């Protein structure tokens, strides 16, 4: 049986990357929240 997680850098960046986050209002809210919390890594 094939496992559900088939890692790929491209698809990961396209969905969870910084620029992908900045495209939407909700994504910008995520970045803002992570900045406020003091996260070292804002996105993948």
UniProtKB/Swiss-Prot annotation:
Residue stretches of biased makeup (Basic residues): 11-27
Any single Gene Ontology cellular-component annotation: ribonucleoprotein complex
Classification via Pfam families: Ribosomal_L34 (PF00468)
Region span, Disordered: 1-27
Keywords, comma-separated and alphabetical: Ribonucleoprotein, Ribosomal protein
GO terms of molecular function: structural constituent of ribosome
Entry-linked InterPro entries: Ribosomal_bL34, Ribosomal_bL34_CS
One GO BP: translation
UniProt superkingdom: Bacteria
Homology family: Belongs to the bacterial ribosomal protein bL34 family.
Name recorded for this polypeptide: Large ribosomal subunit protein bL34
Organism for this UniProt entry: Nitrosomonas eutropha (strain DSM 101675 / C91 / Nm57)
Underlying gene: rpmH
